[in-house]
Amino acid sequence: MQESINGNLSEERISGAQQPEAWNGAPVNGSPEQQSASGAESNQLRFQSSLSDSERERQKATDLEHRRAAFARHFGCAPGSEKHVESYSSFDEKDTRVQLAEFYRFNDGHLKKWGYF
């Protein structure tokens, strides 16, 4: 499935309909028509890590920073440690799981609005 030089997506869809391929780019019928320069078949699985370690650590640090800011907005003070930031996450209106009452203030606007207490 090759895209044309000018980037026409309709040609890509047409060629994809003519040659069905698996998610890793191998032909579905398993024919060894295409071989790489090393001679290995193209239908072998290719390992691709979704995130590198540095990206994963950067995302975790960004997430903790957002939680720390939400903690400070919610409780009006800075958290004592990272443990508090991780355990006392921000209130999510779309989260349908049971929310523990001790994590939130009773006079909070979210709780009054949604009638949890």
Curated annotation (Swiss-Prot):
According to the UniProt record, one GO cellular component term is: host cell cytoplasm
Its domain of life reads Viruses
What Pfam families does this protein map onto? Phage_B
Q: How is it modified after translation?
A: The proteolytic cleavage of the internal scaffolding protein B releases the scaffold protein in order to continue virion assembly.
Report the EC code(s) recorded for this entry.
3.4.-.-
The site annotation (Cleavage) covers: H74, F75, S90, F91, R105, F106
Basic and acidic residues: which segments have biased composition? 53-65
A Gene Ontology BP annotation from the UniProt entry: proteolysis
Where in the cell does this protein reside? Host cytoplasm
Bias-annotated ranges (Polar residues):
31-52
Function text: Participates in the assembly of the viral procapsid in the cytoplasm. Forms first a 12S pre-assembly complex with protein H, and F and G pentamers, then twelve 12S complexes are joined by the D protein to form the procapsid. Internal scaffold protein B is released from the procapsid upon genome packaging. Autoproteolytic activity cleaves protein B and probably facilitates its removal through the pores of the procapsid.
A further note on this protein reads: Phi KhT, a host-range mutant of phi K, can grow on E.coli C and B, besides K12, and is more thermosensitive than the parental phage phi K.
Family that this chain belongs to: Belongs to the microviridae B protein family.
Q: How does it assemble?
A: Component of the procapsid complex composed of 60 copies of the internally located B, 240 copies of the external scaffolding protein D, 60 copies of each of the viral structural proteins F and G proteins, and 12 copies of H.
Q: What is this protein called?
A: Internal scaffolding protein B
